[in-house]
Structure formats: structure tokens, C-alpha cells
């Protein structure tokens, strides 16, 4: 059986992330990881904060902190939010770790030995006002391709084109805002991607048919435009230093590796961080080195937003290929479009949009987890609106699932006491229901296996709806007047549906799923996946099992709540 290695694109260290960041990489990876674990697979889910480069230095400067101290605090703050969202990382590391430094420097040495790194003198932007060379992200200006006036010197976030700072129109310093910029000569290391173009093309060709269209089209676009040699070092104070044993002159000048060189390597570095915590029982290399062979090969799935696709499908594979060592390369790239806020961008400065820490202040994580996955921007951009969020939570979670659980358990307790009633043997309605549930479960599983999250959410919702339809058809509140045994059967069947829901809903809404399972006094709280036979029989909770009525799973969002959220976070543009 394959082992599953799963990574999310590393969140930048420079602040708490918004809902778009959450649904674009971390949340779907967590949903998929949870599902695979429930199915009995060996799963390793790795993520980390991306701590090097311009964002870290700028954010630390704004806070008046040394950059290492800022990163330590920001890492802990992000980790607390992700814990609140119940993201079940096996390990959440830091790209500033010693492990990442060692592996990044190893990669650089190997690339150099194999003839894929070259030292070049280049002309780079220098700011007299700041007294320093300005790395890519320190330069802002207008994109020459799309005209976006807040493009950075490394990439335009509007059109996703990769840039050099000298490409920008009307460039300015991101530190001081000064437009008095000069171009001076400095030396840097270049990764000779042009020499690896053919190998990367062959590698992409072997995988792109399996990838979603979004990922494969971006990778192919980059390859068609040709891979260019790119500088992989920067003039920064914070980063993985260039090793002095290989490049003594550059090391003496304080050069560090470009953040997009060391950040993907941190997937490996974080795995070693995890392994080093328990080296007798964890083997990081078995997940990354020569991991395609043996009885339990690794299948590697990456999750990211579309702006990260070029780096993961072209640049990092080129690095791995050039090292000439059997490092594991990605098998499946799950890419996402943008989640917008009323059709526009999330903005911290303009106080527009919901950031993850604030989201947890007003509502439990399961509300957000379900809505975001059910509306994940898979085939196109999707828009968050408070009206849509409220309607989804109230209809799907409060009415369809939460109300079903409360109605069944409350009514059964009132009429039959605090144990699951026995009632009559299963009849035609129960047989029909079991077949319907098994079919819907198979559909749900199919979508989860192929990482189609919106479709999986729709199938999960259909499972919940099937229970409501069964309850309305049988109407135990009427049935009990003339056929108490039949009413008991209906409630016993419905309680088994609740337990089934608690298992299959676990990837989406883990806290609520646990609350549903905890309602039944079973021997253990098991979330082991439901088989087709178990789905058909609906008898995992036997008659006589004690149960309790849990607190309301999902409180409805009122009109007053809706207006207060829009006032706090901003609503539709006027």
C-alpha cells in the first residue's frame, strides 16, 4: 500500500492569513489527509512557515523586532490559528531551521558540482536612501505586462508573470518609498534552468495528464515560454547563507539563498525536523530519498494556490533533477484559483475581508471549514459573501445536519428513554435507505479520491439530506401513535445514520463529528471509515446503547449577526 506524503504551500511568516490562504492550500490538504487516515493509509502531512526573504525583514522592521525574534513569535501565532482550525499537521515546521539550512546548502553544492550553478556579475537595483541593494520584493512598481501598479520585483500577483526588478515601470523602494533608485553591479549565483529545460519537459509530460487543468496549463505555459537562468542568491541579512566552503567570496559578502530556492526544500527540512524529534521511530529519508521503490512507495500530493504553481511544477523539479539524487518529486499538484471577498481582494489595510484569527473569534472552526471546502475555488475564482456564507451555514449545517441530529435524539429520549430502542426488524424502507446511503457514500469516496472537493461536499450534503427524507417519510412522531415498534425502528435507523454521519463528515467538520460520536456510549470513539456493507446495514450502533443529546451542533446565523459581520469586516462594494 502506498504511503501518502502531503504538503501545503508554506504560508509566509509576515502575518495572519486570510480565508483565501486557508482554502487555497492548508484546509483542503487537511481534509484529504484526514480522509486518507480514516481509510487506513499511512499519511505524513507536512507544512511550515516560510520565514526567509523580504516579507520577514519588512514585517520585523515594522514591528521593531530583530527578524529572528519576530519570526519565532509569528510562527507561534500562526500555529495557534491553525490549531484552532483543527489542521492536523503531522508537523508544522520553520524554514529557518538548521535542518533546512543543511539540506538547502547540500542541494546548492550538488547543483554546482553538476554544472547547474554559475556565478555571474549582474546589475541590481540599489537605493541610496536605504543604503542597500534592493532584493526583488523590496522593489515595487507597475507590471509591464498587465499594468498592475502594485507589482513586486519578483512576480506580479495580478497576472502571475515572474519579473525582475528592472522590468518594473516607475519602480520604487518598498522600504522608504524612494524613487531615487540606481542600478549597480553585484555578484550572484544563477541556477542554469535553461540546461534543465528538456528534462523538466519530459518530467512534466509524464505527470500533467493526471494533474488538474489549472496546474498543468500553468506548467505548460512556463515551459513553452522557455526556462531562463535565474539568480538564486540575494543581498539580505536573513536567510540560508551561501556556504563558505564552496563560495567563500559570496559568503564573505553575506549573500543568502533566494527564498524560492530554500522554501520548497523546507518540505524536506520540516520532515527532518519531525524525524529528529523521535529518530528511533521516524525516518525522514524514507519519505523523500529513493521513495518510489520498495513495498510501500510514496505518493506525494502538493496543495497550493495558482500563483505558487510555477515554482512547484517547474522551478523546484528543475532543482531536484539537477541535484542528480533520487529525491521524491511531486505526483499530483492540486491547485486552486482565488477566493475573493465580494469579488475584490482581501485587504488588511482597507479592513476588507475575513482573516483566520478573526474568523475563529466569531464562529467555530467547523462553520468555516465546511463553507470554504464546499465553495473551494477549484475550476474558477469563487467569491466570499456574508449572505452566501449565512445561507450555507443555516441550510446545510443548522437545518440539514444539526436539526436532524437534535430531532432524532431528543424525540427518542422523550419517548423511549436514554438507550437506542430496538423496535421492529428492518423493513423495505430501511433496505431502500441503506442502498441509497451506500451509493451516495461511493460517490463521496470517488470525489475525495480524485480531490474534487466541491463535489465531495455536495455528496456529503446529499448523505445528510437522505436521512431527512427518510425521517419525513417515516414520520415517527405520527408512527408512534399506531405502531410504536415501527417508530422505534425508525429512530434506531436514524441514530445509526447519525453515527455514520459522524464518521464520514470527519474530514470536513471534525469537532462536530466527534460530538456526534460522543453522543453514543460505544466502547471507543472510532472514526474508522464505513464500509459499503456497514452503510447498507446501518446497524453499527446496536439497540440498548446508551446515548445523550449533545448541545446544539450549529446555531443559526441571525439577520442581526449578518449585519454585524458586514459592519465589522465590510460588505459589498458601494
UniProtKB/Swiss-Prot annotation:
InterPro entries hit by this protein: Anticodon_Met, Met-tRNA_ligase_1, Met-tRNA_synth, Methionyl/Leucyl_tRNA_Synth, MetRS_core, MetRS_Zn, Rossmann-like_a/b/a_fold, tRNAsynth_Ia_anticodon-bd
GO BP term (any one): methionyl-tRNA aminoacylation
Mention any Pfam family matching this sequence: Anticodon_3
Q: Where is this motif: 'KMSKS' region?
A: 345-349
Keywords tagged on the record: Aminoacyl-tRNA synthetase, ATP-binding, Cytoplasm, Ligase, Metal-binding, Nucleotide-binding, Protein biosynthesis, Zinc
A GO molecular-function term, please? ATP binding
Cofactor(s) needed: Zn(2+)
EC number, as in UniProt: 6.1.1.10
Cofactor details (free text): Binds 1 zinc ion per subunit.
Q: Enumerate the residues binding Zn(2+).
A: 143, 146, 156, 159
Q: Tell me the compartments it is located in.
A: Cytoplasm
What's its catalytic activity? tRNA(Met) + L-methionine + ATP = L-methionyl-tRNA(Met) + AMP + diphosphate
Q: Where is this motif: 'HIGH' region?
A: 11-21
- Which coarse location class describes where this protein primarily resides? cytoplasm
> Which protein family is named in the record?
Belongs to the class-I aminoacyl-tRNA synthetase family. MetG type 1 subfamily.
Q: Describe its function.
A: Is required not only for elongation of protein synthesis but also for the initiation of all mRNA translation through initiator tRNA(fMet) aminoacylation.
Quaternary structure, from the entry: Monomer.
Protein name in UniProt: Methionine--tRNA ligase
Amino acid at each position: 500500500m502506498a504511503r501518502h506524503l502531503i504538503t501545503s504551500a508554506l504560508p509566509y511568516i509576515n502575518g495572519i492569513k486570510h480565508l483565501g490562504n486557508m482554502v487555497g492550500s492548508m484546509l483542503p490538504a487537511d481534509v484529504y489527509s484526514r480522509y486518507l487516515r480514516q481509510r487506513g493509509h499511512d499519511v505524513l502531512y507536512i507544512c511550515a512557515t516560510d520565514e526567509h526573504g523580504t516579507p520577514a525583514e519588512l514585517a520585523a522592521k515594522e514591528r521593531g523586532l530583530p527578524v529572528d525574534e519576530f519570526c519565532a513569535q509569528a510562527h507561534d501565532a500562526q500555529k495557534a490559528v491553525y490549531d484552532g482550525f483543527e489542521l492536523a499537521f503531522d508537523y508544522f515546521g520553520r524554514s529557518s531551521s538548521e535542518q533546512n539550512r543543511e539540506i538547502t546548502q547540500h542541494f546548492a553544492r550538488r547543483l554546482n558540482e553538476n554544472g547547474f550553478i554559475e556565478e555571474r556579475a549582474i546589475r541590481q537595483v540599489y537605493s541610496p536612501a536605504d543604503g542597500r541593494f534592493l532584493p526583488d520584493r523590496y522593489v515595487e512598481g507597475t507590471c509591464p505586462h498587465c499594468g498592475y501598479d502594485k507589482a513586486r520585483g519578483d512576480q506580479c500577483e495580478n497576472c502571475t508573470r515572474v519579473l525582475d526588478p528592472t522590468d518594473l515601470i516607475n519602480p520604487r523602494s518598498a522600504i522608504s518609498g524612494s524613487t531615487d533608485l540606481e542600478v549597480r553591479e553585484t555578484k550572484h549565483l544563477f541556477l542554469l534552468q535553461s540546461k534543465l529545460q528538456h528534462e523538466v519537459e519530459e518530467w512534466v509530460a509524464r505527470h500533467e495528464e493526471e494533474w488538474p487543468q489549472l496546474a498543468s496549463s500553468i506548467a505548460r505555459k512556463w515551459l513553452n515560454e522557455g526556462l531562463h537562468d535565474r539568480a538564486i542568491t540575494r543581498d539580505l541579512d536573513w536567510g540560508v547563507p551561501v556556504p563558505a566552503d564552496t563560495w567563500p567570496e559570496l559568503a564573505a559578502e553575506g549573500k543568502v539563498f533566494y527564498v524560492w530556492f530554500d522554501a520548497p526544500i523546507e518540505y524536506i527540512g520540516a520532515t527532518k525536523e519531525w524525524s529528529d524529534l523521535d529518530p528511533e521511530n521516524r525516518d525522514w529519508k524514507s519519505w523523500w530519498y529513493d521513495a518510489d521503490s520498495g513495498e510501500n512507495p510514496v505518493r506525494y500530493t502538493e496543495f497550493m494556490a495558482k500563483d505558487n504553481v510555477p515554482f512547484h511544477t517547474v522551478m523546484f523539479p528543475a532543482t531536484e533533477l539537477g541535484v542528480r539524487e533520487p529525491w521524491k518529486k511531486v505526483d499530483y499538484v492540486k491547485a486552486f484559483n482565488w477566493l475573493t471577498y465580494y469579488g475584490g481582494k482581501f485587504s488588511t489595510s482597507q479592513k476588507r475581508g475575513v482573516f483566520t484569527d478573526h474568523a475563529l473569534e466569531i464562529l467555530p472552526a467547523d462553520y468555516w471549514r465546511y463553507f470554504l471546502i464546499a465553495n473551494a475555488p477549484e475550476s474558477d475564482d469563487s467569491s466570499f459573501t456574508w449572505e452566501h456564507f449565512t445561507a450555507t451555514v443555516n441550510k446545510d449545517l443548522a437545518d440539514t445536519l444539526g436539526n436532524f441530529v437534535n430531532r432524532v435524539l431528543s424525540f427518542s429520549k422523550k419517548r423511549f428513554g436514554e438507550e437506542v430502542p430496538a423496535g421492529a426488524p428492518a423493513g423495505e424502507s430501511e433496505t431502500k435507505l441503506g442502498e441509497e446511503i451506500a451509493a451516495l457514500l461511493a460517490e463521496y469516496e470517488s470525489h475525495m479520491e480524485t480531490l474534487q472537493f466541491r463535489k465531495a461536499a455536495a455528496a456529503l450534503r446529499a448523505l445528510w439530506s437522505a436521512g431527512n427524507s427518510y425521517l419525513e417519510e417515516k414520520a415517527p412522531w405520527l408512527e408512534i401513535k399506531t405502531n410504536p415498534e415501527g417508530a422505534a425502528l425508525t429512530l434506531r435507523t436514524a441514530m445509526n445514520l447519525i453515527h455514520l454521519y459522524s464518521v464520514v463528515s470527519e474530514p470536513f467538520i471534525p469537532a462536530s463529528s466527534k460530538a456526534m460520536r460522543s453522543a453514543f456510549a460505544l466502547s471507543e470513539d472510532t472514526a474508522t471509515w464505513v464500509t459499503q456493507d456497514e452503510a447498507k446495514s446501518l446497524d453499527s450502533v446496536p439497540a440498548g446503547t446508551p446515548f445523550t443529546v449533545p448541545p446544539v451542533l450549529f446555531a443559526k446565523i441571525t439577520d442581526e449577526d449578518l449585519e454585524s459581520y458586514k459592519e465589522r469586516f465590510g460588505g459589498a462594494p458601494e
